[in-house]
């Protein structure tokens, strides 16, 4: 896991509490210092929310996204695990993921 994640983990966990996150996992290049370009790489997260009232998902999703981008000062991708339908992509995710927060 890259240093920028470790240095901001407490902020990320507080944000997860604020935005009703059930699980947040790190995926992609930020898992490895070797693959992560500190100037160019975005940060990819796998996300699952707690049950929310209808109509709250968009505000919650985009609020969390903006918060994470503000913390890291870079582009963030949020991938909702329930939205992943491609089995090859899912297999790749399952091989390399790191739990950062669980409610």
How should these model regions be labeled?
Residues 44-48:
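Short, aliphatic-rich beta-strand segments
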Residues 1-25, 29-38, 50-103:
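Catalytic core of pol beta-like nucleotidyltransferases
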Residues 41:
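The conserved glycine-aromatic submotif of the RRM
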